[in-house]
Amino acid sequence: MVQLNQNFIDTITQELPAHLSMDEFIAACDRPLRRSIRVNTLKISSDDFKTLMQPKGWTFDPIPWCEDGFWISYDEEEQLGNALEHIQGLFYIQEASSMLPPTALFTPSAFTTSAKWQCVLDLASAPGSKTTQMAALMQNQGLLVANEYSASRVKVLHANVLRMGASHCALTHFDGRVFGEYLYESFDAVLIDAPCGGEGTVRKDVDALKHWSLDDVLAISETQKALIESAFLALKPGGSLVYSTCTLNRLENQGVCEYLKQVYGDAVQFESLSDLFDGAERATTAEGFLHVWPQIYDSEGFFVAKLTKTASVPRLQPEPKLQKNFPFTPASAKQAQGIKDYFQQDLGISLPDELIMVRDDEFWLFPHEFNAFIGRMRFQRIGIKLADSSKHGFKVRHEAIIALAGKQLSPTAKTVDVSDVEAKEYLMGRDIPLATADKAQGEVIVCYGGAPLGMAKHLGNKLKNNLPRDLVKDKVLLLPEQTKSL
């Protein structure tokens, strides 16, 4: 049974829209959430994913605000996070409401000029659901800066970015309040899914509201105001900003947006989201925001606001000095050609036309747009590591294969397709015996379902596992095919 604090009920009763009832709200909070996932179109199309999973008993109910999002049902009690297809990065387990903010930011009308959307900021990124959703919407083009304040959550963010094959991200680890000054008016679009009271999450955490207090709400709303102001300062004139939370009270939602409007006046233009998807008007406020109560779409509670920065605003502090000793240098023409030839000739992968950078014996691929950010802030991770070099040549890195060996593969690529059982063995760090002995082929890309799992060394009679030890799994779930239609 859900635990609803009486102080919360008293407060939210005054804010609930007239067309909704408190009884329906409480009943919705007491129901378990529907399972929902988002297909990772960086690796597989939604149609192909459904074709892959329907024989395993999955049914798909489209989420109206996300083209690649689905409520799912299937006959398995196991944790989906252990599923082979999840480990492979074909889908992300993501609550339906949390797919709203990236959709709101990347509306078709946003793409008005080819110059827009080259630099995007996700101010509070972990664990990475919205970051990787935006990476897919950007099709790994441009630069996506993903920031996370919590050190432990940066590791989770990085793991999800790599698993999903997002190659154009730069990760940072800062308090989001510094971005307005360090990267003043640098981004075409900014998403801030702000830390909040989490009132909308009660359907998956029955104790989320047990200790609710107005004092806590007031305190966190002050942090949110500082974060949205920092995000607004980091936004270019003409750019779009989406502010979202998974909470329900006005202080953390409309109140934060109204604060920004009070400070910056006509430079802040609220954009209506009433036409974002069919049925959006059911959750649209007078300001044009989406205030999603859990009973409206049978989802988590959520809030989404979109605004345009119509004019430049003064920065609050002098521009910081550029930082020195950036550890990467551009590859020479000879080095760049060498790494391109290795990927093309040995692996069958055409490298994207991006910056090839060198650090010691490491070769990296950076988005072109990152040039404008060198020295302005310290980055935890940039782009993807392509390979290590030695006197014997190059050694490809796992993350490069995961990010680039999908749509970039040529017909001549050295790949070995494995069964689901063999894929499970591979992900558990084991070598794969080959049914028929053949001539040794050296480095090969191991694939399952048309998407890469990683590298192996073809020794003729087996595939020697080259999966990095830190990625070896203790458990991999194979979802069984169903013998009856569902």
UniProtKB/Swiss-Prot annotation:
Subcellular location: Cytoplasm
InterPro entries: Methyltr_RsmF_N, MeTrfase_RsmB-F_NOP2_cat, MeTrfase_RsmB-F_NOP2_dom, Nol1_Nop2_Fmu_2, Nop2p, RCMT, rRNA_ssu_MeTfrase_F, SAM-dependent_MTases_sf
GO MF annotations, alphabetized: RNA binding; rRNA (cytosine-C5-)-methyltransferase activity
CC per GO annotation: cytoplasm
Alphabetic keyword roster: Cytoplasm, Methyltransferase, RNA-binding, rRNA processing, S-adenosyl-L-methionine, Transferase
Role this protein plays: Specifically methylates the cytosine at position 1407 (m5C1407) of 16S rRNA.
Name of the protein: Ribosomal RNA small subunit methyltransferase F
Natural source organism: Shewanella baltica (strain OS223)
